[in-house]
């Protein structure tokens, strides 16, 4: 089938509690399909909404008191049965999950305050809906109107039967959503130009990146199996390329670390029970919550990661998850009377620390860092450090890593993994 012949998306927009309300369903259909006889619309449309896999976008908006602009709380999901999934969110998840508790509060105050888009297509299958769900998360992360974006997984799929249709089907979906609500769903070119889109954890990884990520996650699992038995800090050494390819992998990796190894306990899909059986979950345990940080040397990138973490609910305030190395060292240090940390006096430990551009860490003190060796200070404050390191990118004498530094920090248990840039 040619791209022009692909079936167009079927999109219904209705109040969230109205899935059982025949009148509301008919009203939503009439809005999209005009004066067509409902009996014909039912046969051609309702079948793909209620009997096929669908993707859904639940949203609620509040006005920002300072800017008077609308701010959206959004949940994106996919399901094989939209009716049952809606009932699950309303009756079960609203009692146990923070994201759905918030929607429930809003519904109690005003039944018209929470709506959902239900997206169907005659060519939808499980893999295709998972890809659509993942890209919707990716795009909505770059929407300025979205304040909070909820889901608990990255779902980019590998090869499958209708994969060659995905880009066209998604573009048609986004174009129609943009037509219906341009504030929540801005034009594609606006989304793709945003810094959050470029650093999003929802990019689809290449085979090399996936292999590197799985190796790192496996090494983390092994490291925690050891550190759960003793207090020895471990370091996972990742050798990688610079640029956008690295940023995409680091963002994707950190999101997986937080949502899988920190064990949020949220599973969105009834078919996702296998997530409970992952190696990392078995090692850590469902109720053993951990804290992870991402350290970045550049202030602008710290800001971008902070925005992503806040939108995805990984932190409640700024600088809780993404920090500069000096901020992290200060956070986990005994304090002087002026509030500054003492690098030689660690206080407490983070569970997992992901260090971007570890080659830029200082190996001697300077005006902004009173310690003697940043890599050493980070290890003393962390149970496991994942260091992304490229010795060819060292820029200053204060960042020079001597052979003895490398031998001391990267003993036989390190992970040395290189991934390459591929278009």
Explain the meaning of each model-derived region.
Residues 213, 217-220, 224, 239-244, ...:
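Conserved helicase motor core of SF1/SF2 NTP-dependent helicases
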């Amino acid at each position: 089938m040619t791209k022009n012949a692909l079936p167009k998306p079927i999109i219904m927009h209705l109040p969230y509690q109205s899935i059982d309300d025949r009148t509301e369903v008919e009203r939503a259909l009439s809005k999209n399909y005009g004066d067509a006889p409902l009996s014909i619309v039912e046969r051609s449309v309702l079948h793909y909404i209620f009997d096929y896999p669908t993707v859904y976008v639940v949203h609620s908006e509040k006005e920002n008191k300072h800017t008077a602009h609308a701010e959206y709380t959004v949940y994106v999901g996919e399901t094989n049965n939209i009716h049952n999934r809606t009932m699950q969110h309303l009756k079960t998840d609203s009692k146990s999950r923070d994201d759905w508790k918030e929607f429930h509060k809003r519904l109690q105050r005003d039944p018209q305050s929470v709506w959902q888009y239900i997206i169907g297509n005659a060519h939808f299958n499980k893999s295709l809906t998972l890809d659509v769900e993942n890209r919707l998360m990716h795009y909505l992360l770059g929407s300025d109107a979205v304040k909070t974006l909820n889901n608990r997984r990255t779902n980019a799929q590998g090869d499958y039967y209708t994969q060659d249709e995905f880009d066209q089907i998604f573009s048609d979906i986004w174009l129609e959503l943009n037509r219906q609500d341009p504030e929540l769903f801005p034009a594609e070119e606006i989304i793709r130009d945003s810094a959050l889109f470029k650093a999003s954890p929802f990019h689809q990884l290449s085979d090399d990146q996936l292999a590197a990520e799985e190796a790192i996650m496996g090494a983390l699992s092994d490291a925690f199996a050891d550190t759960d038995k003793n207090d020895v800090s471990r370091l996972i050494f990742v050798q990688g390329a610079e640029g956008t390819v690295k940023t995409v992998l680091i963002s994707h990796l950190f999101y997986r670390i937080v949502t899988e190894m920190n064990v949020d306990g949220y599973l969105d899909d009834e078919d996702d029970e296998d997530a409970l059986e992952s190696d990392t979950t078995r090692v850590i345990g469902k109720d053993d919550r951990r804290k992870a940080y991402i350290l970045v040397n550049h202030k602008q990138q710290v800001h971008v990661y902070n925005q992503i973490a806040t939108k995805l609910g990984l932190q409640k305030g700024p600088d809780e998850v993404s920090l500069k190395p000096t901020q992290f060292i200060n956070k986990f240090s005994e304090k002087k009377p002026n509030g500054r940390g003492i690098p030689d006096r660690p206080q407490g430990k983070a569970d997992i620390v992901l260090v971007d551009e570890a080659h830029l860490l200082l190996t001697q003190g300077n005006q902004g860092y009173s310690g003697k060796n940043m890599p050493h200070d980070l290890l003393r404050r962390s149970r496991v450090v994942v260091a992304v390191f490229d010795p060819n990118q060292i820029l200053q004498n204060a960042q020079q890593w001597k052979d003895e530094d490398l031998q001391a920090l990267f003993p036989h248990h390190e992970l040395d993994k290189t991934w390459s840039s591929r278009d």
